[in-house]
């Protein structure tokens, strides 16, 4: 065991010279262990794991034997001795760190084809795939599906970050219903212990799938949890506008402006409400206030309704 050298590396020697001696001692321990081990692959694996851990944690090291490339060489020698999934997992991690995402993906998929496949190995395969130029979002979702499936049925809390990453991909693909389903799964997983941002993000997905009652319920939950954020009553107003409830939208905008008097888009939304109510003068006054405050899209509305 490398107890002494591992503690030395972990605690960091106070001077550069002492750190160098510490690292040399660690390699000496590995070399000593190799003379007594019948599994040469494990020796190279432990060497690669130690070197990679140190090199990734301290990028200022300039010792040739303590670089990520040295870790790559060591893990490849381990695989040359015996091609084990645990070795491939580490090789994948090293390739990922170096930005060699295609190689990392190939390694993780070798792990996934073995009995060592886990939610983590599927997740990192998805992360590697996502970093490959031109990767198909559907393929990445399928990999995340496998990661989540490895978390049990129903899934454990371990699946939570994987579900949120799948939500992001579904939103990019405009799969709003599926995204909402994933948000619901996440909510159930956390037994409802979520914050205001969760309700805001789920509201956005429901809004895009035209579930306005559902969107309204979620944005109102966000307001209850964080009444000081002006974004939420402004978003509530947007929902009311889509529901053609302009009086209530105007009340929501008043609430937002009470918190943030210079919230430009609120004046634009107020103008839209007045247009829908046939109040041209009030609408143009609101649009001009939005323009004064720097709203980037109000010029088109002014040109359309106030010229």
Question: Where in this protein do the model-derived segments appear?
Answer:
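Short, small-residue-biased leader/transition segments that mark boundaries at the very start
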Residues: 2-9
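Structural marker of alpha-solenoid helical repeat scaffolds
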Residues: 36, 80-81, 113-115, 150-154, ...
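Residue-level recognition of tetratricopeptide repeat
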Residues: 40, 49, 56, 84-85, 93, 116-120, 127-129, 154, ...
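Register position in tetratricopeptide repeats
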Residues: 53, 97, 131-133, 172, ...
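Terminal, low-structured helical/coil segments at or just beyond the last alpha-helical repeat
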Residues: 276, 280-307
